């Protein structure tokens, strides 16, 4: 354990379990044994180049788990985060790892274990993207790839290794992966790893790591085996639980349009514009810059649209939102930052010009609170690169997203 928890975060199992039951029965969205909440990435004291990577990746506002989980991890505390996939767990521990690396030392300093090859490669991708401006070197050690290639890359030097337990243990056993400088150890989807029978390998790996190591455990559920791991590996962990949102996708017809390439999205949107203007609609993109770009493109083609994003001052945003709510403006282009703040009850069409960067945000963009349960239509523009995210969204919410029929106007 690289740091000690501040007073008040000491972990009492009985108290936690009792409080957890209250949370699950009650109205609270989350429970944490750590009280700091940071509502923006800028407030977290992160390195400038890490912030650049976070914003370039398309994040604007931290999710509930990121607001509570990034800072304790950055402080070197042991952290247990219990939340469903899609709540932003990956970016939480990636940010915590990237903040603490010594980039001048080209040795493995962080080891992340994941249950599947696909997830390990996905984490590698996120870690590399967020750490792009810091010059991070990341490698995924997974089964089904060349052992010799793994050895060559590890020999050349990396800052972070992400991998599946089998291949990582093999690399440690062969001494191709040297544990001496590893100071952070993360288990992602711990429950899934245990259910796949990786328990012994996880223990074997842990035995080979330095004694003073920071541990992060991320898991959707906490079965007894996972709790046992936290007891054996961790010291006074900070615990954070995030409940699923109470928004619902019920009554919302969800469709996709295959656009193959990014460049084709604009034409597709223009083809749909007449339909958009029949009703009130919101178009979501992933970055502030893209809001401005798309707004200019639409206006240059004589399409009337409003736009709002986080760079605008609050007063301007309020005026634009007032016009939108009153119905004097009918098509709004925006980012995830405002997804939760838009009173979308009167909006019957949402277009995801860009699919969200994490599944959680899909719900905030198109979901409705059950109290109102208004009907609606959501249209997702899907390039070849987006197909995996669309699959993840369907799996996460247990929904089927169908291809857009030609009579879309009749559905509104």
From Swiss-Prot:
InterPro entries: DEAD/DEAH_box_helicase_dom, Helicase_ATP-bd, Helicase_C-like, P-loop_NTPase, RNA-helicase_DEAD-box_CS, RNA_helicase_DEAD_Q_motif. Ubiquitous. Preferentially expressed in flowers, young leaves and roots. The modification N-acetylalanine is found at residue 2. One of its GO terms (cellular component) is nucleus. It catalyses: ATP + H2O = ADP + phosphate + H(+). A motif (DEAD box) lies at residues 188-191. ATP binds at residues 83-90. Its EC number is 3.6.4.13. Pfam families: DEAD, Helicase_C. One of its GO terms (molecular function) is ATP binding. Residues 251-412 form the Helicase C-terminal domain. PROSITE patterns: DEAD_ATP_HELICASE, HELICASE_ATP_BIND_1, HELICASE_CTER, Q_MOTIF. A motif (Q motif) lies at residues 39-67. Coiled coil: none annotated. It is an enzyme of class 3 (hydrolase). Keywords: Acetylation, ATP-binding, Cytoplasm, Helicase, Hydrolase, Initiation factor, Nucleotide-binding, Phosphoprotein, Protein biosynthesis, RNA-binding. Gene3D superfamilies: P-loop containing nucleotide triphosphate hydrolases (3.40.50.300). CDD domains: DEADc_EIF4A, SF2_C_DEAD. The modification Phosphothreonine is found at residue 145. It is found in: Cytoplasm. Residues 70-240 form the Helicase ATP-binding domain. The Q motif is unique to and characteristic of the DEAD box family of RNA helicases and controls ATP binding and hydrolysis. ATP-dependent RNA helicase which is a subunit of the eIF4F complex involved in cap recognition and is required for mRNA binding to ribosome. In the current model of translation initiation, eIF4A unwinds RNA secondary structures in the 5'-UTR of mRNAs which is necessary to allow efficient binding of the small ribosomal subunit, and subsequent scanning for the initiator codon. Belongs to the DEAD box helicase family. eIF4A subfamily. eIF4F is a multi-subunit complex, the composition of which varies with external and internal environmental conditions. It is composed of at least EIF4A, EIF4E and EIF4G. This is Eukaryotic initiation factor 4A-2.
């Amino acid at each position: 354990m690289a740091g000690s928890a501040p007073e008040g975060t000491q972990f009492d199992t009985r108290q936690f379990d009792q409080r957890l039951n209250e949370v699950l029965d009650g109205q609270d969205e989350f429970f944490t044994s750590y009280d700091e909440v940071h509502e923006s990435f800028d407030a977290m004291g992160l390195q400038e180049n890490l912030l650049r990577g976070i914003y370039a990746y398309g994040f604007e506002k931290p999710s509930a788990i990121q607001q509570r989980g990034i800072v304790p991890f950055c402080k070197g505390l042991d952290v247990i985060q219990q939340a469903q996939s899609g709540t932003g767990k990956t970016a939480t521990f990636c940010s915590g790892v990237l903040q603490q690396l010594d980039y001048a030392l080209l040795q493995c300093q962080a080891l992340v274990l994941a249950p599947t090859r696909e997830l390990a490669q996905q984490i590698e991708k996120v870690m590399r993207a967020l750490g792009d401006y810091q010059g991070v070197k990341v490698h995924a050690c997974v089964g089904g790839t060349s052992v010799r290639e793994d050895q060559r890359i590890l020999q050349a030097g990396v800052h972070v290794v992400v991998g599946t337990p089998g291949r990582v243990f093999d690399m440690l056993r062969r001494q191709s992966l040297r544990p001496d400088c590893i100071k952070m150890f993360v288990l992602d989807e711990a429950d899934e790893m245990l259910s796949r029978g990786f328990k012994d390998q996880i223990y074997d790996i842990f035995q080979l790591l330095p004694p003073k190591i920071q541990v992060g455990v991320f898991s959707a559920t906490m079965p007894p085996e996972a709790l046992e791991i936290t007891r054996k590996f961790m010291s006074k962990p900070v615990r954070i639980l995030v409940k699923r949102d109470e928004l619902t996708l019920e009554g919302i017809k969800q469709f996709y349009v295959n656009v193959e390439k990014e460049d084709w999205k604009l034409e597709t949107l223009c083809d749909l514009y007449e339909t958009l203007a029949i009703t009130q609609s919101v178009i979501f993109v992933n970055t502030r810059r893209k809001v401005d770009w798309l707004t200019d493109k639409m206006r240059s083609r004589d399409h009337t649209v409003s736009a709002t994003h986080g760079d605008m001052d609050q007063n301007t945003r309020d005026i634009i939102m007032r016009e939108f709510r009153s119905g004097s403006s009918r098509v709004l282009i925006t980012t995830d930052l405002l997804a939760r703040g838009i009173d979308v009850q009167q909006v019957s069409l949402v277009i995801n010009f860009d699919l969200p960067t994490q599944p959680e945000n899909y719900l905030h963009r198109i979901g409705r609170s059950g109290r109102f349960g208004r009907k609606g239509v959501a249209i997702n523009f899907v390039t070849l690169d987006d197909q995996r995210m669309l699959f993840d969204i369907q799996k996460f919410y247990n929904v089927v997203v169908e291809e857009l029929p030609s009579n879309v106007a009749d559905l509104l």
